[in-house]
Amino acid sequence: MLPEPININKWIEENGHLLQPPVNNYCLHRGGFTIMIVGGPNERTDYHINETPEHFHQLKGAMCLKVVDDGEFRDIIINEGDSFLLPGNTPHNPVRFADTIGLVVEQDRPETALDRLRWYCSNCREIVHEAAFHLTDLGTQIKEAILAFDGDKESRTCKKCGTLNYSKPQ
């Protein structure tokens, strides 16, 4: 039997408290693709690299999608009501502000696919650390990788300039 439609606005009213740091997401659907509600604010400095495309739709407020586009760091502002399809293999850091909510759709990963979280030096933009893993649970694995980075001072220290980096903006 098919499930009933979900009223997204009602779901947010009743379940907004489930959107907790550091990722602030809640998976509404899994199977073929994942549909997530993501709230703000978030506090992350990592850039996610997903081999498959990601679709962002901003339901409330605006967000800033920091990307590395052909080697250049730039910001893409996604305003309330806007949708944006991010191509696969694009390093991105979704910056969500307070009292904002978005919907993100991601394709299930092929068994050979690796997701990566990459941290760039806050001072010189060199790659400081990268964690790679086959993603099976968006709700837990990204958080685990962030916490592991945060707990490893050597991984957070830039080999080029010596700057100590953090998993949260300072």
From Swiss-Prot:
The annotated pathway is: Cofactor biosynthesis; NAD(+) biosynthesis; quinolinate from L-kynurenine: step 3/3
Pfam families, sorted: 3-HAO (PF06052)
Give me the residues that bind substrate, please.
Answer: E54, R96, E106
| Enzyme superclass (EC) | oxidoreductase
User: Binding positions for Fe cation?
Assistant: H48, E54, H92
The UniProt record lists the keyword Cytoplasm = yes
Query: Which protein family is it in?
Result: Belongs to the 3-HAO family.
Q: What species was this sequence derived from?
A: Scheffersomyces stipitis (strain ATCC 58785 / CBS 6054 / NBRC 10063 / NRRL Y-11545)
> Which locations, inside or outside the cell, does it occupy?
Cytoplasm
Q: What is its main location?
A: cytoplasm
The cofactors it requires, by name, are: Fe(2+)
> Which reactions fall under this protein's catalytic activity?
3-hydroxyanthranilate + O2 = (2Z,4Z)-2-amino-3-carboxymuconate 6-semialdehyde
Is Cell wall biogenesis/degradation included in the keywords of this UniProt record? Answer: no
Q: Which CDD domains match?
A: cupin_HAO
- Keywords for this entry? Cytoplasm, Dioxygenase, Iron, Metal-binding, Oxidoreductase, Pyridine nucleotide biosynthesis
The EC designation for this entry is 1.13.11.6
What InterPro entries does the annotation carry? 3hydroanth_dOase, RmlC-like_jellyroll, RmlC_Cupin_sf
Binding locations of O2: R44
Q: Give the range the annotation lists for the signal sequence.
A: none
Q: What's a BP term from Gene Ontology annotated to this protein?
A: anthranilate metabolic process
What the entry lists under NCBIfam families is as follows: anthran_nbaC
Q: Which residues bind a divalent metal cation?
A: C121, C124, C158, C161
Q: What does this protein do?
A: Catalyzes the oxidative ring opening of 3-hydroxyanthranilate to 2-amino-3-carboxymuconate semialdehyde, which spontaneously cyclizes to quinolinate.
- Which GO molecular function annotations are given, in alphabetical order? 3-hydroxyanthranilate 3,4-dioxygenase activity; ferrous iron binding
Listed GO CC annotations = cytoplasm
Protein name per its UniProtKB record: 3-hydroxyanthranilate 3,4-dioxygenase
- HAMAP family assigned to the protein according to its UniProt record, in alphabetical order: 3_HAO
